[in-house]
């Protein structure tokens, strides 16, 4: 039988395996393990609990540091740094200086907000820190004037304070004056942080400068409505307020009120009856007209053209621009003028008024004789410096015999045929034009000019006056007169072509002509010699050292001349009324109830 594989376990000791272990000493085993550990240095003999505690503390420190960095970056976005705050307090202009361009970063919408988990734990601390930044410390609150000086936009600060105090915006009551030198008689002023003593004193001091003023105070703001005696600009008004209330310019707002706003007028009217409001003087007209019933009913009056024509006729106004300007200036006192300004057809009304006034004046002039017309002009002339001797002295200075001039002048005024034209000729600078122009100005005559001879209507002004003047007639002008105007110089009826009208037939008014041409010595104009009276002016017109004329020829001088030689000129006596009173002037409007009584 073959032998079995493997060890032979039949023996007691099992072959080479020891059944029992030999005992050894413990110290020798420990030394062997220590020597093996020191040599290899591969095993950490530290306790597991101690190692876990150190790693947890390190992790917490790292998380706290990271959280503080994120919080600091977040604060930089929303909290102004102390350095920039100090810089802005020193000078607001430095805040606008930047080396890098400023771009506004738009915050994008975030669907999922990231949360570190630390913000919730520090929420209480952050809220307390924010409260400490906003709330001022007790006992260190600044007054309103100091806060105004430190704020960047002072005007916006005053606007906000005014609206919070009075419940209405300052710009709702005023209209803007961009220039500080534009004058106005009405001003709305807001004063900030005025002392009570100065405010009470201002109620008395403002009476010397204003015909009406309104003063109301709410908190630190004082509202003023000033209607000054003399219009002032904003700079002058600020200077006045500084002297009265002892405040600076930054504590004041001033703009003129909205005078055409019914809401603003009603605000001032109702505010005048409120408690704590002080007013002085009569209510301004622009407030009364928009609030009081009597003024409101008067403003509803319709425009009456006849009243405007009557006013222009009484003031002897015929120019359209002059009528429009002067009548508009009466809107504050005249109800019809106010209705004229509210009308949408002002140019048409002005044109119609000027046309009707010219028609009435022309008809009145034609109705009067030359004697009556001269008498009317003498009455209308003011009693100023003027003497008839000035006219006589000037004629004698030119070597003209006064008796002969008076005889020809008498026939000239009467319009006698062949004596209807006076010609003053001579060298230049002898006073020919001055003499004739002064007489024409007194009698309100008309001027014709040969420069318009190419037009068919250049003689049309002769239909509008009692006397005409052709100044500085040259040789071509005399040729034209010799060819076409002989019958006009005779004083007979001739035809004048008028614009937009049929040719008009009229008697030529007395005509004055000044010229440098000697018509008497030229045989070519021999047919004009018998139709004109000629006066030669050989002497140069005298002037004093200051360049003033040596003879005062004005309206007063001619009025005195006609009064002095009224009988010598065979002028008829002025026609009076039945009872010796002068005739009543033209009346274009119906009489009122009080006037008829």
Swiss-Prot record:
Region Disordered, residue ranges: 119-141, 574-597
Keyword annotations: ATP-binding, DNA replication, DNA-binding, Early protein, Helicase, Host nucleus, Hydrolase, Isomerase, Isopeptide bond, Nucleotide-binding, Phosphoprotein, Ubl conjugation
Short motif Nuclear export signal, span: 90-99
Sequence motif: Nuclear localization signal, positions: 75-77
Residues making up the signal peptide according to the UniProt record: none
Entry binding sites for ATP: 426-433
Residues found modified as Phosphoserine: 81, 91, 104
Gene Ontology biological process terms, A to Z: DNA replication
A Gene Ontology term for the protein's cellular component: host cell nucleus
Domain called SF3 helicase: residue spans: 400-550
SUPFAM superfamilies: Origin of replication-binding domain, RBD-like (SSF55464), P-loop containing nucleoside triphosphate hydrolases (SSF52540)
Reactions mediated catalytically: Couples ATP hydrolysis with the unwinding of duplex DNA by translocating in the 3'-5' direction; ATP + H2O = ADP + phosphate + H(+)
Principal localisation: host cell
InterPro entries tied to this protein: Helicase_SF3_DNA-vir, P-loop_NTPase, PPV_DNA_helicase_E1_C, PPV_DNA_helicase_E1_N, PPV_E1_DBD, PPV_E1_DBD_sf, Rep_E1_papillomaV, Znf_lg_T-Ag_D1_dom_sf
EC annotation from Swiss-Prot or TrEMBL: 5.6.2.4
Residue ranges of the region described as DNA-binding region: 137-300
Subunit structure: Can form hexamers. Interacts with E2 protein; this interaction increases E1 DNA binding specificity. Interacts with host DNA polymerase subunit POLA2. Interacts with host single stranded DNA-binding protein RPA1. Interacts with host TOP1; this interaction stimulates the enzymatic activity of TOP1.
Role, per record: ATP-dependent DNA 3'-5' helicase required for initiation of viral DNA replication. It forms a complex with the viral E2 protein. The E1-E2 complex binds to the replication origin which contains binding sites for both proteins. During the initial step, a dimer of E1 interacts with a dimer of protein E2 leading to a complex that binds the viral origin of replication with high specificity. Then, a second dimer of E1 displaces the E2 dimer in an ATP-dependent manner to form the E1 tetramer.
The protein's name: Replication protein E1
Organism (species): Canine oral papillomavirus (strain Y62)
Lineage: Viruses, Monodnaviria, Shotokuvirae, Cossaviricota, Papovaviricetes
């Amino acid at each position: 039988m073959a032998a079995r594989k493997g060890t032979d376990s039949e023996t007691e000791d099992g072959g080479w395996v020891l059944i029992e272990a030999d005992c050894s000493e413990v110290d020798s085993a420990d030394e062997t393990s220590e020597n093996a550990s020191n040599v290899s240095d591969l095993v950490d003999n530290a306790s597991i609990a101690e190692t876990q505690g150190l790693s947890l503390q390190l992790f917490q420190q790292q998380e706290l540091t990271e959280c503080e960095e994120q919080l600091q970056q977040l604060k930089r976005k929303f909290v102004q740094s102390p350095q920039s705050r100090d810089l802005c307090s020193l000078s607001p202009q430095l805040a606008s200086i930047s080396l890098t361009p400023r771009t506004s970063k738009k915050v994008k919408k975030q669907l999922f907000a990231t949360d570190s988990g630390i913000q919730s734990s520090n929420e209480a601390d952050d809220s307390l820190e924010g409260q400490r930044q906003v709330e001022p410390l007790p006992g260190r609150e600044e007054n309103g004037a100091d806060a105004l000086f430190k704020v960047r936009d002072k005007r916006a600060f005053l606007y906000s304070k005014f609206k919070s105090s009075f419940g209405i915006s300052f710009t709702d009551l005023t209209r803007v004056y961009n220039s500080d030198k534009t004058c106005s008689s009405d001003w709305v002023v807001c004063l900030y942080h005025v002392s009570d003593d100065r405010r009470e004193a201002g109620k008395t001091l403002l009476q010397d400068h204003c015909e009406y003023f309104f003063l109301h105070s709410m908190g630190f703001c004082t509202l003023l409505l000033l209607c000054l005696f003399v219009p002032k600009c904003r700079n002058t008004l600020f200077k006045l307020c500084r002297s009265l209330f002892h405040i600076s310019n930054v504590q004041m707002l001033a703009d003129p009120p909205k005078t055409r706003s019914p809401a603003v007028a009603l605000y001032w009217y109702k505010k005048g009856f409120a408690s704590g409001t002080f007013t002085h003087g009569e209510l301004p007209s622009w407030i009364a007209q928009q609030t009081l019933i009597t003024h409101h009913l008067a403003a509803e009056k319709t425009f009456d053209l006849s009243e405007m024509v009557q006013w222009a006729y009484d003031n002897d106004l015929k120019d359209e621009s002059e009528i429009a300007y002067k009548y508009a200036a009466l809107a504050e006192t005249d109800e019809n003028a106010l209705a004229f300004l509210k009308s949408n057809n002002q140019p048409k009304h002005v044109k119609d008024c000027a046309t009707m006034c010219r028609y009435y004046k022309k008809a009145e002039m034609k109705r009067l004789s030359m004697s009556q017309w001269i008498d009317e002009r003498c009455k209308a002339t003011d009693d100023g410096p003027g003497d008839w001797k000035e006219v006589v002295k000037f004629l004698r200075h030119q070597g003209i015999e006064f008796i002969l001039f008076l005889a020809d002048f008498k026939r000239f005024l009467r319009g006698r045929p062949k004596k209807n034209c006076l010609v003053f000729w001579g060298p230049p600078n002898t006073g020919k034009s001055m003499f004739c122009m002064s007489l024409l100005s007194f009698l309100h005559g008309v001027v014709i000019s040969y420069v318009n001879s190419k037009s068919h209507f250049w003689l049309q002004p002769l239909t509008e006056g009692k006397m005409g003047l052709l100044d500085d007639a040259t040789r071509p002008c005399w040729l034209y007169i010799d060819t076409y105007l002989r019958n006009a110089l005779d004083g007979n009826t001739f035809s004048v072509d008028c614009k937009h009208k049929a040719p008009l037939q009229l008697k030529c008014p007395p005509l004055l002509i000044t010229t440098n041409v000697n018509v008497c010595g030229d045989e070519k104009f021999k047919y004009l010699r018998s139709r004109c009276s000629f006066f030669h002016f050989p002497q140069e017109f005298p002037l004093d050292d200051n360049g003033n004329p040596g003879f005062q020829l004005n309206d007063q001088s001619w009025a005195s001349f006609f009064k002095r030689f009224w009988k010598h000129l065979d002028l008829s006596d002025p026609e009076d009324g039945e009872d010796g009173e002068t005739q009543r002037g033209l009346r274009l409007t119906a009489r009122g109830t009080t006037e008829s009584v």
